[in-house]
Curated annotation (Swiss-Prot):
Keywords: Cell inner membrane, Cell membrane, Ion transport, Membrane, NAD, Potassium, Potassium transport, Repeat, Transport. The gene is trkA. The RCK N-terminal domain binds NAD and possibly other effectors. This is expected to cause a conformation change that regulates potassium transport. Part of the constitutive potassium transport systems TrkG and TrkH. May regulate the transport activity of TrkG and TrkH systems. Binds to NAD(+) and NADH. In Salmonella it is required for resistance to antimicrobial peptides. NCBIfam families: PRK09496.1-1 (NF007030), PRK09496.1-2 (NF007031), PRK09496.1-4 (NF007032), PRK09496.3-2 (NF007039). This is Trk system potassium uptake protein TrkA.
Amino acid sequence: MKIIILGAGQVGGTLAENLVGENNDITVVDTNGERLRSLQDKFDLRVVQGHGSHPRVLREAGADDADMLVAVTSSDETNMVACQVAYSLFNTPNRIARIRSPDYVRDADKLFHSEAVPIDHLIAPEQLVIDNIYRLIEYPGALQVVNFAEGKVSLAVVKAYYGGPLIGNALSTMREHMPHIDTRVAAIFRHDRPIRPQGSTIVEAGDEVFFIAASQHIRAVMSELQRLEKPYKRIMLVGGGNIGAGLARRLEKDYSVKLIERDQQRAAELAEKLQNTIVFFGDASDQELLAEEHIDQVDLFIAVTNDDEANIMSAMLAKRMGAKKVMVLIQRRAYVDLVQGSVIDIAISPQQATISALLSHVRKADIVGVSSLRRGVAEAIEAVAHGDESTSRVVGRVIDEIKLPPGTIIGAVVRGNDVMIANDNLRIEQGDHVIMFLTDKKFITDVERLFQPSPFFL
């Protein structure tokens, strides 16, 4: 596939890195020559320096015969104009744009279609982050929760702790503990190394366990791996930007929410707009303020300012002063590995959420959902099976007959409204949504090929 990526920042660069090794012809456009040179030194791709919305630049990038344009520059307006130019002048078939401003996203249905601004797929990073954090609040103790098949199935990542009945026991004993609940452990990472789970695999404390189950059973399965944490009640947010304000709006109906904002004018605006959130003007690194607001009674402290260092330091202080759990928003990928699992319980990467959303639109075959896991090393995907036994490598076959790439596990199959946790004898049918986990994303091309029906396949 011939893909033009506009923007060589963290998201554009990471997307190029993901796609360049999958037999795609990638061209990256940016105004920053240094960034482009750095990418070209690392990967086999073309670069063009210039403004991504200019027709001359797009023509030089190969827009005349490009299959897809992905606009992820730092400017919403540039991304929108680029999609318009690609549509009007070059008839580019697929156009994807990252749009950050809530003012645009709020009216997305009216703004972004072929008769207005021709964007086929809109990526709204702030909304993705809010959704991600909200899922983690719904499942206290989970490191990551990803929904598939319109929320019917979830993949959860949980650290195994002493106190969970499964610790020190084989995976096969889970069926004895929960005879009426189906789940499949897709992978276990032990000391950062993947283990292919089998019934005889002993779960150890400290294991990072990836499992798939019907969404209503996630909490029950988590209770096998750790003592279930009580649902959160009191939440403190730091940062009143788009993410903080959106999160407060989403949470304030069901939780006791306090929000700290260091800009006085913004704090006053939020105090008027938010219905049940208590808004404070102040600095989250102010010990007196945290003490006055009873930080020791807070169930979850979430720092979502645009300053990584401020988020990390305020969360560390909150934890030291008694907050039960702390979560931080981290822009720099290198910081995520450094902080998560130390004093910081969970680090959220907006870039990773954006990449996952982008990949679901640029994958081949009928891939309707992608989630990048373990800092981009692993992937969970939702693919739709098409064809019949003569044209498909999966339709009409039981799972045991399907030649899956190394490190790939089918976790669940959704057929209509029915969720079926995978077993070797489950037969895949036309239209099934198949949820898979890959411990190594380098095999994603093989998975895509597996789900691409071919008139020549017999």
